[in-house]
Amino acid sequence: MRAATIGMALLATAGAAHGAECVDAKAAKTGFVLEMPGIRSEFRPAAGGMVSVANTYQSESPQTQFLYAGLIEVFRDSTTGHLAMIPLGDLKKLFPLKAGAKSTTQFVELSPNKQPKGTKTLELAVKGKETFSLGGCKYNVLAVKETFKNQAGETLDTFTALYAPDLGASLARRYDEGTSSESVVGYETIKPLAQ
């Protein structure tokens, strides 16, 4: 409880120090915009713990995603296709995330005119807490290692999401962690969603 109070105080201080451009937990409930060169993402809370994300790309068609708690993708829609990831377990039981938590969830991937070829697995491991900066704003994030595997157990993708629970959004992804090829791809600015 004390850590949550301190975290909220830090977020409030960040918002006060940098004016209206910093979005805090309360403002996030009405939506916000994250941007990096070539990508603009509008985050809006939705029913059932979902977060709707409207992505606009400089060189691609727009895309809409629905992410459970702003972290786990369950639906994607664009002019290039549609994809639903149906969890075979209760995602609500995974949240709120805490440092040291680990979980494994199976999904069935569905897309139009394509039969599922088996299940996929998402392994989550909350490695710890960090601070991440977006412009002049600082946010407390959880480093969440996400590993996607096919039914045979082969790794399809792995990265560490820098997830801000107060915003319900991953602010960046860290790839090839702990190697000489380590890189971070993340948003650079945040602002409230214009009403």
Describe each region flagged by the PLM.
Residues 13-16:
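N-terminal signal peptide c-region/cleavage motif recognized by signal peptidases
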